Amino acid sequence: MSGVVLLVLAIILITIFSLIYYTIFFEFDETTFSKRLRVLTEYAKRTNADKPTPDVLGHVSDVYDHTYIVSWFRTNDLSTYHETVHDDTVEVFDFLEQQFSGAQATVTQRVAPVAAELDAFVVTNDAGDVKLRCPQNFSFDYGQLKCVPEDPCSGRPPGRYPMNELLLDTLVHNQHSDKNYSAGAHLYHPTLYLRCLANGSHAVRECPDNYTFDAEAGECRVNELCEGRPDGFVLPYFPEALLVNEFVECRNGEHVVAQCADGQVFDRALMTCVHAHPCAFNGAGHTYITSDIGDTQFFKCLNNHEAQLVTCINRAHGADGQYACSGDARCADLPKGTGQLVHIHTDDTFEYASGQMICDNYEVVSEINCDTGDVLGDKLFINKFKLNVQFPLEVLEFGACAPATLNNVSVLNDTFPIENAPNDYGVNMQTSVVGRTSMVAKLMAGDDPDTAFGENVLLARDVNTVGLNPFTAEPIDCFGAQLYDVMDAHRANVCTESGNDLLKTVEFGDGAFLSVFRDDLTGSDADYKQFCAISYESPLKIVKSDHFQRRILTNILQSDICADLYTTIYQKYTTLARKYTTSPVQYNYTFVKRPENMVVYAKNTRFKNATISEPAFDLFAAQTTDKENGFARSLFDPFADGVWRSEPGGDGDHWAPEVPPTQPEPELEPESETELDSDLELEPEFSPLILNKKDLFYSCFYELPSFKLSSCHAENDVIVDALQQLRASVKVDTECELAKDLHFVLNAYAYTGNNIGCRSVFDGDDVAVVKEPVPSYVFTNLQTQSNDGVRYNKHVHVKDGRYMACPEHLYDDEAFACNAEPDKLYYLENMQQ
């Protein structure tokens, strides 16, 4: 029992000793020890004549610009005592005095590299500049402000290189010794070698078993296998390039490749040549090569008598002697599958390196893929424009990914296409506006996106052309069968169906406008005089002028909608009952506004807002009787001699004098007042219809007129009263109950969903909101009454599932009410239908 205890105790002691030993061994830093020894030696040389060596010695061990570290170590064993961090703008360290003192002057740069000497650098101390050198096999890295090991592949082309003692210490043992390696520089490791890759990186490789690295040839060679063996001895050695009819045998103490007789193959199991198919003895899955196939091909047995030819990117030979495909297809274009492949992205506008791949023997050993995601993304500018260009977040620069800028991205074209979001009018603006690459720099600098966009675009109107080629920015006449610019809609081009030849250019003057849904692109409106034209010169202001409204005060024309509606209403509300006799003269004509200013006065009529306090005639004077209708004549008639008249279908206003009767009218016997009351009721007097002014509201999508709202002024009491009655007695179809408030504006339309379209109409008798048999328009967005989410019609309002038509300036959104003017009639027209 005592012997076992002693054995266990001995094992424990040995283990403890081993742990302590290896701890000391692995923690020992030979480089640090050498540095401290030199520091101690230098201090002793310069001070031992005056003072003894201190127990703890400090020295500046690291410098980071104005920050430096003082390392303190014990002088008896050179072990670490402690470290302190200091700022040289505050205090400096005196090595000989071993103490700190206040900084006397500010030094802008403490450490600087030496351009011609990679291992040297200059340190500026309090006494001046001192040139220092890194240890051998080190170079100074100014970016890290320290000495770093030299790159083992620096100055070497890609390939295989032998491993000397220096490479073994630094790459295998990870030790950077300060010793001199020149004595054993010609000695190399027998199987390890250095593989330098195309990108300057490196890897340590080892030859297979029974192979030795040939330093001169730079490749692994098989060891001699025939030492002490007779000639003709067949070796169980099957190198990768050995054909199916070949084998290796010994001759004169060396191994050579021999061949079987014609028609024979070498059976590696029997170790002899045989007359048989290569698959006969090995079966399915066996692989072999012949002299008539390529270096990347091999045969694979399907059964005992059939084989298929397999073609690879790279043919590999496994430890089991079988062939297999290996390698990455991406390395196939590199010589011998080895080298560096930089990925270059090229489009119509930019070119940049997006990454790189390093291949070694058809295998990818390293790969860098930068984040080339579009930094602009799917961002919309001014809520409708998208840049049809990709600018990466990162690019490859100096072998690493770096933020993309116009300095590391090549500009191939100064302009790029711009797309616009789909709209209800099908307007494609890619020929109207193109982007300038200067926009990208502004966006990358953090400028306001919309401002950067608007200030860096080229407009077709700027170069006086109908359209621009989206990719080259050159002026064009055709881009498909039709070409127009909604930002400059005073003309349009009609081209052949192929879009190659221009047929004609349509100019839009007064009364005409661009109508995108018509084959001839021409719409007509007598009131329209290019009111949607944009007068800005700044591209930023132009591209922002996507939706606006123009208001125009003008005259009611004889043939416009105001005249038609008011004439119909006037006739309805001034038509007498059968017991009255219709006056053929006064009510068969309508007073209208001439092209020039003209005032038409009503016949002896007192308006509701009249302020005349004295009578214009004697009410009790004897009245004369009109022979034509039997009614008493007016005592005051300013139109007794003539009247301005405009007949429906006539050619304007003209003066029509009254024709005197050819013979005197016989006087009628006076009748008693009682008889007049009982036999004849007098026809009531109505104020004449005066058609004078109207307000027009044109909604514009850029220079494309979309909706026209006519606000017809009523200057007649009959019309004002009629409007009040019509609005108070609106008829509504059951399906259009939610849209009943469309009645404020005639011809207003709203789609309420479920295939129901409602429209406000005047049928000659009443105002009604009716359901259309087939909806004129079906909208996916009920709130905006559009399909693209844009509210083009500013006069139709939607709130809480209810629909109202009201001039935009009269609409009360909070109360969902229309403050319609009592003396105005509103009519809405879709100009792009």
Curated annotation (Swiss-Prot):
Residues annotated as transmembrane: none
Subcellular location: Virion
Domain Chitin-binding type-2: 223-281
Major place of residence: virion
Recorded superkingdom: Viruses
A GO CC term attached to the entry: extracellular region
Signal peptide: 1-18
Disulfide bonds: C207-C220, C260-C273
A GO molecular function held by the record: chitin binding
Keyword list, A-Z: Chitin-binding, Disulfide bond, Glycoprotein, Metal-binding, Repeat, Signal, Virion, Zinc, Zinc-finger
Glycosylation sites: N137, N180, N199, N210, N408, N413, N588, N609
Family matches, as Pfam families: Baculo_VP91_N (PF08475), CBM_14 (PF01607)
Function: Probable capsid-associated protein.
Protein name: Capsid-associated protein Vp91
